[in-house]
Structure formats: structure tokens, C-alpha cells
């Protein structure tokens, strides 16, 4: 991972209590390897790494990435 590469970072802001964030592994078997629970207003800054290839978010949240901003409540 290139430390100067900001595209690997993303921000999750909870819009309600109990938003679940799951980190998923790379490899032939995709597995959950980390989970966090965020309450309303809490912000998590995370990044993709050699171990994390995907993130699943359950609940109402805003996700900001280098590609733009997503709202889990809105259909694009």
C-alpha cells in the first residue's frame, strides 16, 4: 500500500444508533474479520488494506470515498 495514496481511505458517518460496519477479508473465502457498531453522529475513518477487500454497512449512514458520497437511504 502506498501511504500517499488517499484513495484507499473512506469515511462512514452514522445517521442513527446501531449502524454496523463489517470488514471482509481477501482470498478464496470471503469472511468477516472485523466489526464495529456506530451510534448517531459517530464517524469512522477506515481504509482498504492487504487484508480488507470489502466493507458491509448495515443501517442509515453516509459514506464518503474518493469516488463521491453515498447515502444508504437514497436510491441512485
From Swiss-Prot:
Keywords for the protein's UniProt record, in alphabetical order: RNA-binding, Transcription, Transcription regulation
Record-level GO BP terms: DNA-templated transcription termination; regulation of DNA-templated transcription
MF GO annotations: RNA binding
Keyword Transcription tagged: yes
Keyword Transcription: yes
InterPro entries on file: MtrB (IPR000824), Trp_RNA-bd_attenuator-like_dom (IPR016031), Trp_RNA-bd_attenuator_dom (IPR023558)
Self-association and partners: Oligomer of 11 identical subunits arranged in doughnut-like structure.
Family to which the UniProt record says this protein belongs: Belongs to the MtrB family.
Function: Required for transcription attenuation control in the Trp operon. This trans-acting factor seems to recognize a 10 bases nucleotide sequence in the Trp leader transcript causing transcription termination. Binds the leader RNA only in presence of L-tryptophan.
Protein name per the record: Transcription attenuation protein MtrB
Gene: mtrB
Amino acid at each position: 500500500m502506498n501511504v500517499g495514496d488517499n484513495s484507499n481511505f473512506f469515511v462512514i458517518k452514522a445517521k442513527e444508533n446501531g449502524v454496523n460496519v463489517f470488514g471482509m477479508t481477501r482470498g478464496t473465502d470471503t469472511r468477516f474479520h472485523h466489526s464495529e457498531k456506530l451510534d448517531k453522529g459517530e464517524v469512522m475513518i477506515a481504509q482498504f488494506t492487504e487484508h480488507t477487500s470489502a466493507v458491509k454497512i448495515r443501517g442509515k449512514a453516509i459514506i464518503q470515498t474518493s469516488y463521491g458520497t453515498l447515502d444508504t437511504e437514497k436510491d441512485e
